[in-house]
Structures are given as C-alpha cells and as structure tokens.
Amino acid sequence: WNIYMADYSEAFFLPWKGTAKKISYAASLGAVNKIDDTNAENIKKWLKDFNMVSVREDSGANTLEKLTDKKIQVTLDPTLLLSTSDWNRITGVRMINKPYIFYYSWAYPDEKMNELVHRFAKEKNLEVYVINSSRWYKYRPEKFEFTLYNESGPIVFLNLMKYAEYVFV
C-alpha cells in the first residue's frame, strides 16, 4: 500500500463491489509519514468496505486510523511466521552453482548504488545477478555488467538471496 512504489495501484485495495469480506493482513505503507490529500481521499474511500485491516508498522496504523473510523491492528510481517527449516524447504537447491552477488532493487535508477555494486563486484571478482525484469528493461543497467536472472518469482528471489556470497538491496 506504499503510494510511492512504482507499481502502486488501486487494485491492491480490492475496489470492486462484491459480497466477500475484505481483510488485509500485514499490509505495509513503507516509510510513508505523510499522505497527500488526493491519495488520502482515495485510501479512505477504498478502505471503507474493509471488514478488518492490519498493517506491519505502528506508523502505518496511526496513518490509517486518522484517515478512517477503523481500529487498525499491527501484526507481524508474514515472513517472520516461518521457521528456518520452513524457509530452507521453500528455497530448495542452489540455482546458481558458483559464488555470486545478488542485487535487488525495485527500479535500478540509482546510478550511485549501481556503481557501488559494480565496483564491489570487480573487487571480489564476482558476477552480479539481478531480477525484476520490467524495471531492468526500463533503466537498462547493462553498463554495470549485471546479469539478469531470467526466471522470477518468490522462490527464485529467496533462493538467490539465500545462496549469494553478498546481497545488496
């Protein structure tokens, strides 16, 4: 529910009418401290039909309670509900069979960060793997010699994160 994310969408608030209950579990507004008037009105309208709302951060709960007449619960990030053995089972066997750096960015527009990762990789003599192909093609960070891992999804993300020598986010 972070209004500053590139893929922010009304669809995340289930705006269609229907008879099903609308419940959020551990939504995140990110580090948003202030919501402009237009977004505030939209969020207020979209949350009106929710039966229950929970978020991950106290700040998000405070923000949403000010916009709505709802009691907003703060709940644990769902990634923290699994044990190490659960995560190991999910991630599976190593997908890249050599040492590497995993760099995850939601957009790759940060030239300074890209350059930092590139220099670090050169120092360590390691290849840098990235995912998030839609952003890759928009920002074209090939000049930094990053390798786009062609598969994607939660399991790929977790696997690349788990087995990397170094991770940059």
How would you label these PLM feature ranges?
Residues 24-31, 63-64, 105, 112-153:
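Catalytic donor nucleotide-activated moiety binding site of glycosyltransferases and closely related
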Residues 158-169:
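A donor-sugar binding/catalytic signature common to diverse glycosyltransferases
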Residues 76-82, 133, 151-156:
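Short, acidic/turn-prone active-site loops that include or flank metal/cofactor-
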Residues 26-107:
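A nucleotide-sugar donor-handling region in carbohydrate enzymes
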Residues 1-45, 114:
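Aromatic- and Gly/Pro-rich donor/ligand-binding loops
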Residues 43, 117, 157:
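Acidic, amphipathic alpha-helical patches
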Residues 19-20, 50, 144-145, 163-164:
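Short, well-ordered alpha-helix to beta-strand connector turns
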